[in-house]
Amino acid sequence: MTHSEYRDEYCGAVTESLIEQTISVVGWVHRRRDHGGVIFLDMRDRAGILQVVVDPDTPEAFATADAVRPEYVLKITGRVRRRYEGTENANMTSGHIELLAKEIEVLAKSETPPFPLNDEKSTVSEDLRLKYRYLDMRRPQMQDRMVFRAKATSAIRRYLDDHGFLDVETPILTRATPEGARDYLVPSRTRPGNFFALPQSPQLFKQLLMVAGFDRYYQIAKCFRDEDLRADRQPEFTQVDIETSFLNEEEIMNINEGLIKHVFKTMMDVEFEKFPRMTYAEAMRDYASDKPDLRIPLKLIDVADLMKDVDFKVFAGPANDPKGRVAALRIPGGASLSRKQIDAYTKFVGIYGARGLAYIKVNDASNINNGVDKESGLQSPIIKNMTDDVLVSLIERTGAESNDIIFFGADKASVVNDAIGALRQKIGLDLEMTTCEWAPLWVTDFPMFEETEDGRWTSMHHPFTKPKGSVEELKTNPESALSIAYDMVLNGTEVGGGSLRINTLEMQTAVFEALGIDDQEAEDKFGFLLDALKFGAPPHGGLAFGLDRLIMLMVGASSIRDVIAFPKTKTAECPLTQAPAEVNTKQLRELGIRVREKVQADTSKPAE
């Protein structure tokens, strides 16, 4: 029991073991019901809900119960008893018992909340929920998610502690480094015109901890990125940050795979087999994504070689373009899709840059070896542009059967991958094609660099990732270089990513050169790291998990905002505190900052 001045046990933890005992509980009134002279109060705390019965035999308690309203804070003392037969609630831990009240004390009254807290089905705008987040988090679903997160985080710590990792804190105020997103800057009062940056990750500091000899490090770290927000993005987020020395790629992956297995087993009693692995090239070829959802048994099939000579520029153009791709996606049973559904999918792929969505309905594939019946066997506006040989080859290569549909993507490879990869995921979920609840995997062997639109190289992960091969090989063929990097994917979501790191000055300099970072820029931005590499840096590597994203998947939430206590909106604002906000002139003057007025566009005249 949980003894204190106020209570003996949590409401949700009162069970049959306490029958006939007198106890005190505290909490909020979840519901109040008056049934023919007997008042029922559902009392709620973080552990759950307890039914309290108040009858007229205790007139003082009855009068108090008659006056209370939802969200009043009460202390109730009474006797635990078994519920009458037929009134049990198997969905509640306390569903077989109730508390017969003797005394009720009002600890705090409540105004009527701006939205109901006892109806999970009520539709409430997210902005209103975030404005009154302290009320929103009283809802049982939010309480459960916050408790789940806390326990999962504890399980993570226990696993890492048991495996010899040390929890070491790294600075929040650091310097700006290019890691792919804009930094949040903090002005220095003591050095006017200079700024700290909030860390996008503890990357460099954890590498320095390896140089310092702390060979197994972890941290539940706050990270900050000033970027456009999506369902799985926040300006501040939490990362399970891990780094090790003297372990190879396989050993690091095994430790982190074990961590996820431990958390799922501890929290959900879910057991995983060994995670499958595929290379980045295989993932892009078969799933058009570097984070494929393997619950969905659909694969893309390359058909560019069949389309090089067709009388259809939409296909022939990309088929003959070295940077193009023509891919087919077969949907079993998809011939039943309506014109309206196909139009909706066409609109969907347009979001990703596709200029249309070609398809062939396979109504009858029974006589495919005897040629193609274009009248009844296949149905599509595009088949008139293809020979029978091409159509037969398409059906055979995709394995299409009667009543299937084949969708096509034909464009630059990047557009096809984005559009058809997303279509694969959407159709798989829309048509309920998932074959299992959880599908983890590792994706490995990422390209070291990717080319920008202006022809420069940029790091696919970050510039401290160790490449495969030698310095000479990197300098000779940077476009072919692969990194010793690995991402953990779960149900189509990247939950973690890591790599081996560069631990020699020679290789780090070569990578900077490939990225167009000259010696002076490297010294200015990363001089402290380059210096550290001169003093015996051990072979090291690590990984970071997005804690918010992992918890979101585990509890089935639709957004990480639903598993963060006080999240920001999609516009990086906090409706609760009204942050960000203006500060007074005195504070700005102390920091040597002057705010420029935004120039308002003249909207009185039409644009020319």
Curated annotation (Swiss-Prot):
| Domain of life of the native organism | Bacteria
**Which of UniProt's keywords are assigned here?**
Aminoacyl-tRNA synthetase, ATP-binding, Cytoplasm, Ligase, Nucleotide-binding, Protein biosynthesis
- Annotated region Aspartate: the residues are 203-206
Q: Which reaction does it catalyse?
A: tRNA(Asx) + L-aspartate + ATP = L-aspartyl-tRNA(Asx) + AMP + diphosphate
Kindly give the SUPFAM superfamilies that the UniProt entry links to this protein: Class II aaRS and biotin synthetases, GAD domain-like, Nucleic acid-binding proteins
MF GO annotations: aspartate-tRNA ligase activity; aspartate-tRNA(Asn) ligase activity; ATP binding; nucleic acid binding
Q: Kindly list the residues the record flags as site (Important for tRNA non-discrimination).
A: 35, 86
Record: residues binding L-aspartate: 179, 225, 461, 501
Q: Name one GO cellular component term.
A: cytoplasm
Compartment(s) of residence: Cytoplasm
Q: What are its E.C. numbers?
A: 6.1.1.23
The EC class name is ligase
Task: Tell me which residues bind ATP.
Answer: 225-227, 234, 494, 546-549
Principal localization reads cytoplasm
**Similarity field:** Belongs to the class-II aminoacyl-tRNA synthetase family. Type 1 subfamily.
Assembly information from the UniProt record: Homodimer.
Q: Which PANTHER family match?
A: ASPARTATE--TRNA LIGASE, MITOCHONDRIAL, ASPARTYL/LYSYL-TRNA SYNTHETASE
Q: What does the UniProt record say this protein does?
A: Aspartyl-tRNA synthetase with relaxed tRNA specificity since it is able to aspartylate not only its cognate tRNA(Asp) but also tRNA(Asn). Reaction proceeds in two steps: L-aspartate is first activated by ATP to form Asp-AMP and then transferred to the acceptor end of tRNA(Asp/Asn).
Q: What is this protein called?
A: Aspartate--tRNA(Asp/Asn) ligase
The gene for this chain is aspS
